[in-house]
């Protein structure tokens, strides 16, 4: 049986539409979560336990902003937020050749992401990545922390670095804005 070449797969497979969240605290740092490993070997291989911002798929008929709010809550329990900005463009990333046809359930060539920046207005006790939504949602992270925005590309899995660099560029002015109200 002959398998499709990576080039053929890229031509055939679409991008998955996703929403991403850069959640800033009043000190201008961004919330990142460490990908939980072990539940799914494919996911473990795909992500390699890096840190990343909350993100997830946009459901059919769902607005990207609504998806961003939903994904943030489903992954962190956070709902105390104010919208600060929306990235001006969709951000794309492609899966590496060796993951095409298997990662993202084999249905996508990568992701097309719409990014939103929010200010966290709650108390840190609201953040719960281990039992998000009071345990209603599967934990995608096993830890979280606040991090400098410009450091994010070095903390993410290699094939998403350019996408994260685009997000950092889009939101570069926000840390200063939120620090000074």
Regions found by a protein language model. Give the residues of each.
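Charged phosphate-binding loop/patch that engages nucleotide di/tri-phosphates or the phosphate backbone
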Residues: 149-181
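Hydrophobic (often cysteine-bearing) scaffold residues that line and stabilize catalytic clefts
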Residues: 15, 64, 160, 164
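Short glycine/proline- and charge-enriched loop/turn segments
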Residues: 39, 44-52
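Unchanged
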Residues: 57-158
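Acidic, metal-coordinating catalytic segment for phosphate/diphosphate chemistry
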Residues: 1-27, 105-106
